[in-house]
Amino acid sequence: MKIIPCPSSPLLARRVAEAAGIEIGGAVFKKFPDGELYVRVMEKEGVVVGSINSNEDLIALIFALDVLENAKAVVPYMGYARQDKVFQEGEAVSIKIVAEMLESRADEVVTVNIHSSDAASHFSKLKNLDAMPLVGEYFAGKDVVMISPDKGSMERVKTAAKHAGCEWDYMEKRRIDATTVEITPKTIDVEGRDVVIVDDIISTGGTVAEAARILYGLGAKSVSAACVHAVLAENAAIKLFNAGIKDIIATDTVECAFSRISVAELIAENI
């Protein structure tokens, strides 16, 4: 099988090919004047690599998979995974539909840190890889404390901190009275410390920006942000820097200026 890079993951696809010792296959992706996509794949079988960070990314990935007689799908960032259940009557469960689209065309689907176990449950042929150890290794030897912006991401931060060899904590909401809620790290004093806020996805950046302001208010020396998937929608990077974030560190599941960590070898070992 050859690697077929989608337009959303050209660099990562080539890194995966190099790490796995697999050739790049021939494919053409272009757009017609009316905005419709044209996809041609000059292979009968292949591993299609493409993150879903937009509707166009999804269509390009599905079209490429549909051409192949024997296909694997590598979706480093699985978009639509946050709508993993019906929250209000009448809602489409987006990830369920995406799972059906992918698994009807691919023998296996490989992704990295899908947003939740509920999202993963909609797949029957999913291999969900964990890049948090790689995030942790990036900070190995640095005197930092890792903080989860909420209790829900606690296990992710725990994993990253283990591989960084550093302390970790999570932000805890504590109700003071009927109208006041205090948000602080549960146990660690961050005064004078270099703090790294760790999460799986940074999308609009609102949660991380608010956490940064709180941490600076508690005397943190510096606050950086680290994540697997740097979606960074709606000028999120500007929002984070305005909140005092010193640096943003991410993997290349979503290719951007902050992609310092590559998941290529992790993927290559699992295809």
Swiss-Prot record:
The active site is at residue 173. GO terms for biological process: 5-phosphoribose 1-diphosphate biosynthetic process; purine nucleotide biosynthetic process. One of its GO terms (cellular component) is ribose phosphate diphosphokinase complex. It is found in: Cytoplasm. Signal peptide: none annotated. D-ribose 5-phosphate binds at residues 175, 199, 203-207. It is an enzyme of class 2 (transferase). Its EC number is 2.7.6.1. It catalyses: D-ribose 5-phosphate + ATP = 5-phospho-alpha-D-ribose 1-diphosphate + AMP + H(+). GO terms for molecular function: ATP binding; kinase activity; magnesium ion binding; ribose phosphate diphosphokinase activity. Belongs to the ribose-phosphate pyrophosphokinase family. Class III (archaeal) subfamily. Involved in the biosynthesis of the central metabolite phospho-alpha-D-ribosyl-1-pyrophosphate (PRPP) via the transfer of pyrophosphoryl group from ATP to 1-hydroxyl of ribose-5-phosphate (Rib-5-P). This is Ribose-phosphate pyrophosphokinase 2.
